């Protein structure tokens, strides 16, 4: 038995053809799943009984269960703990804006990257999610909020480029007009900086936004915060970023979590200006989320503002990330860890 959500439309057409079914049935099934949110073959009224039986013998539609749901009293952000059939739990977050609903999805159960400011990596990685398991987060969230999701952010638990093949398939699926039809420019992928995979992603020539978890203006600080920096230098990472925007003509976003006394000085800001000058980029400053397992403290609000103003004065487009759902353990991985610890 296979999870039908792991199939592209072309793959499902091929399966239909090889199993003596008309190829157009594949498109009908896609419409039921992705357009009408019907996750039971028996409820697909324009599919013949014999075809339904064949589908049930060969496929299932894996939609995770909601084990916990939290709704922010501040901004209406909805955070879900989803449980897959093997008992593993991940989290997804739906953020509501005037321009539409955005979902932050997880790409792995846990993470092996070891970034010191991130809760999802504390217990390591359990396994990769399949493309179907990632897209199921979007399908289930839409069903829960009774509204369409128009933007997708790959910033939940896991390193997307450490699960490259499944993530690429997921991106193509959600962009497919016969599936969720979410425009590539409404998709953001965040990575800690796996240099060869950034270049591979560039060669896909997608129009998604690439967000780099930079968090430091030099190799010394970055190595202290992110183990990946011991494998790829800042210079190698920036070279990959230049390749990405030359290939795709898409602006890079640099994410920079400000940690008190670590990377938030004026000198650090000036170093950041130096390495980002001349690049088609935007810097997103993030007040770091404090995690019990590390000793990082959030920079003071006035220091964050001063850091931002220093960058802006030198022509660097800079914003401070708006905190969504801060009253319900919004930091990546916090909800999952707390739930597992208490159950």
Curated annotation (Swiss-Prot):
One of its GO terms (biological process) is rRNA base methylation. Gene3D superfamilies: 1.10.150.530, Aldolase class I. GO terms for molecular function: 4 iron, 4 sulfur cluster binding; metal ion binding; rRNA (adenine(2503)-C2-)-methyltransferase activity; rRNA binding; tRNA (adenine(37)-C2)-methyltransferase activity; tRNA binding. Its main location: cytoplasm. InterPro entries: Aldolase_TIM, Methyltransferase_A, RlmN_N, RNA_MTrfase_RlmN, rRNA_lsu_MTrfase_RlmN/Cfr, rSAM. [4Fe-4S] cluster binds at residues 111, 115, 118. One of its GO terms (cellular component) is cytoplasm. Its EC number is 2.1.1.192. Keywords: 4Fe-4S, Cytoplasm, Disulfide bond, Iron, Iron-sulfur, Metal-binding, Methyltransferase, rRNA processing, S-adenosyl-L-methionine, Transferase, tRNA processing. It catalyses: adenosine(2503) in 23S rRNA + 2 reduced [2Fe-2S]-[ferredoxin] + 2 S-adenosyl-L-methionine = 2-methyladenosine(2503) in 23S rRNA + 5'-deoxyadenosine + L-methionine + 2 oxidized [2Fe-2S]-[ferredoxin] + S-adenosyl-L-homocysteine; adenosine(37) in tRNA + 2 reduced [2Fe-2S]-[ferredoxin] + 2 S-adenosyl-L-methionine = 2-methyladenosine(37) in tRNA + 5'-deoxyadenosine + L-methionine + 2 oxidized [2Fe-2S]-[ferredoxin] + S-adenosyl-L-homocysteine. The keyword Methyltransferase applies. Reaction proceeds by a ping-pong mechanism involving intermediate methylation of a conserved cysteine residue. This is Probable dual-specificity RNA methyltransferase RlmN. It comes from Clostridium novyi (strain NT). The lineage of its organism: Bacteria, Bacillati, Bacillota, Clostridia, Eubacteriales.
């Amino acid at each position: 038995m296979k999870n039908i959500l792991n199939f592209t439309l072309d793959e499902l057409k091929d399966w239909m053809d090889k199993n003596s079914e008309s190829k157009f049935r594949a498109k009908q099934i896609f419409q039921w799943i992705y357009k009408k949110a019907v996750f039971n073959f028996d409820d697909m009224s324009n599919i013949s009984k014999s075809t339904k039986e064949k589908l049930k013998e060969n496929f299932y539609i894996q939609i995770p269960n909601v084990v916990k749901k939290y709704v922010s009293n501040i901004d209406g952000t909805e955070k879900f703990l989803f449980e897959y059939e093997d008992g593993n739990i991940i989290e997804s977050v739906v953020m509501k804006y005037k321009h539409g609903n955005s979902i932050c999805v997880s790409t792995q159960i846990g993470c092996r990257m070891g970034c010191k400011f991130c809760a999802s990596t504390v217990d390591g990685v359990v396994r990769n999610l399949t493309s179907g398991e990632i897209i199921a987060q979007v399908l289930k969230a839409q069903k829960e909020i009774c509204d369409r999701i128009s933007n997708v952010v790959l910033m939940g638990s896991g390193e997307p480029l450490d699960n490259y093949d499944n993530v690429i398939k997921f991106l193509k699926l959600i962009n497919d007009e016969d599936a969720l039809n979410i425009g590539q420019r409404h998709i953001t992928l965040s990575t800690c900086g796996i240099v060869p995979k950034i270049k591979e992603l560039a060669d896909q020539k997608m129009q998604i936004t690439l967000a780099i978890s930079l968090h430091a203006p030099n190799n010394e600080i970055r190595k202290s915060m992110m183990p990946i920096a011991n494998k790829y230098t800042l210079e190698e990472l920036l070279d990959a970023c230049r390749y990405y925007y030359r290939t795709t003509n898409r602006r890079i976003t640099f994410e920079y979590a400000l940690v008190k006394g670590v990377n938030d000085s004026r000198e650090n800001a000036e170093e950041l200006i130096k390495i980002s000058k001349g690049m088609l980029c935007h810097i997103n400053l993030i007040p770091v989320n404090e995690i019990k397992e590390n000793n990082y403290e959030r920079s003071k609000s006035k220091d964050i503002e001063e850091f931002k103003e220093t960058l802006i004065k030198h022509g660097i487009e800079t914003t401070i990330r708006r905190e969504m759902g801060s009253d319900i353990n919004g930091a990546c991985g916090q909800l999952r860890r707390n739930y597992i610890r208490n159950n």
